[in-house]
């Protein structure tokens, strides 16, 4: 029995020794067996996981200093900390128009691409949208940011968007105190800008039948107040008040070419209001030179390129009753015209074949779309002309108003957009007034008159 018991003891000891040899492995094999598999960590924090970050800040709450020990870099720690404290504020993609979102603690910042501003890059500040919020002219600078500018005689205000007078009597501005301006403001109209193809080839015909009447009138208009249209001038020649015109600067007036007759002496009267009495605001000047547009040819068509310049013998004295009209560049002259309505003025006939007005008349006329304009007449409407007026008739420019202004007001400043040219009768139903489109001649005007 004792022998059997000893044999069992020896066997157990041998088994334990063999088992011990199987349990204790070398270091390399033991590391393979005992290494903990990496736990999956989803989301933006994965890129920050280094060293003990997961143990320090994900499995447990950590402080900024503890996270700093892991990153060993303040900038990277700060980026991690912004998301760690309150989550990713950029997760909802709040930045519009391809803006880049940068997360922050309890907030975010949008880095906007050129042409956009605002908390979420929601404001389009390119010139194509509401004129870049500029009150007159807009262009993009070298960095693609909006740069506002003003016409001659004005300067940018502190907001760098509005324009304020830089001279005592700047163009297009009514300065007579008692006149209350009720014209349409342009700030809500810039969003409707419609750019016309300025390279469109003009239609030229060799023989065109002439319409019955020059436009020398404002039919259905209202009496203007003294100084309400201080750029308006009266032309006297063989007869008085045969045409109108507009002051460009102290030495030059623009009118219609068909108003000019060879060898006929012309005088202009600026500051005129009531032709039947002297009001001590009038200034008379002699015309010493006339310049017809180089494309004007009355033998082919009396009203095509119907524009002329008159040089005065002495400069006009600018004041509240004698003020030049503003002339924009070609692009903006066309844009302003497309605002949809303008003002015409003159001393022409107050009804068809009737008497001429003694007091300056004015009328607000809507722009007529080109298709309607073409359908309204058998005569040729060239691309350098436009139609304005009322389909129902009763209101129009008329005989005696030719050469006078069609102006568009922009933020209280009036710009020349047309010249009264011709029409079929006056104020007839279904007929419109035809005007010379000033945008086509801006460069020529500025070149000849040295207008800046």
Swiss-Prot record:
Domain Gla: 40-85
Role this protein plays: Factor IX is a vitamin K-dependent plasma protein that participates in the intrinsic pathway of blood coagulation by converting factor X to its active form in the presence of Ca(2+) ions, phospholipids, and factor VIIIa.
An example Gene Ontology CC term for this record: extracellular space
Binding site for Ca(2+) 4: 54, 59
Entry protein name: Coagulation factor IX
TM segment ranges: none
Biological source species: Canis lupus familiaris
Residues given in the record as Ca(2+) 2 binding sites: 41, 46-47, 56, 66
Record-listed Phosphothreonine modification sites: 199
PANTHER family: COAGULATION FACTOR (PTHR24278), COAGULATION FACTOR IX (PTHR24278:SF31)
Subunit organization: Heterodimer of a light chain and a heavy chain; disulfide-linked. Interacts (inactive and activated) with F11 (activated) in calcium-dependent manner. Interacts with SERPINC1.
